[in-house]
Design a protein with these regions (language model features):
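Long, contiguous binding/interaction regions
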Residues: 73, 116, 123
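Conserved acetyl-CoA-binding loop-helix of GNAT-fold acetyltransferases
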Residues: 80, 86-101, 126
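A conserved beta-strand-loop-helix scaffold within acyl/acetyltransferase catalytic domains
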Residues: 19-82
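Conserved catalytic-core motifs of GNAT/GCN5-like acyltransferases
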Residues: 110-112, 128-147
Length: 156
């Protein structure tokens, strides 16, 4: 990770900044995913939040659903500030998240990515994730159905 970037687990005091990031990045996303109260509820349901910061500003975040009994983690949400898209910042956060697998004792990390999100799909490929397949037209985004790619990474 470049020295001007910091990656860390988000705390309750970061939830308002996380809400602000989601509001900037997701104009057409479900309202609840933009809400600090909803994020707080997710924390109580064994979700962890990670962020990439530059000069104290949250630029990229990921929400992980941890399932320790089944030894897996799912990246359920990944967002980049609109002004910082295309700079490959997600690469560093995914790298850090892979390192969290050992902390939680997880063997598999998986996620679904919009098929048209080329940069994020490339990021997961670069990190050794395997493309398990594409779920065709299975997600409503804005006012249209979109396909989702399913990626997984198994700890060796």
């Amino acid at each position: 990770t470049p020295s001007n970037l910091k990656i860390r687990s988000l705390t309750d005091s970061d939830l308002k900044n996380l809400e602000n990031l989601h509001q900037k990045a997701y104009k057409y996303h479900l309202h609840q995913i933009k809400n600090a109260e909803y994020f707080s509820k997710l924390k109580s349901l064994n979700h962890e939040f990670y962020g990439l910061f530059q000069d104290g500003q949250l630029l990229v975040s990921a929400i992980l659903a941890i399932n320790e009994s089944e030894l897996n983690m799912e990246i359920v949400d990944f967002v980049t500030h609109p002004d910082f898209r295309g700079q490959n910042l997600s690469y560093y956060l995914v790298q850090d998240i892979k390192g969290q697998m050992n902390i939680y004792g997880c063997k598999t990390l998986y996620t679904m990515v919009r098929a048209t999100s080329y940069g994020l799909n490339i990021t997961f490929s670069k990190h050794g994730f395997v493309l398990a397949g594409t779920l065709t037209n299975n997600c409503m985004v804005r006012d249209a159905m979109e396909s989702m790619n399913v990626w997984y990474y198994k700890e060796k």
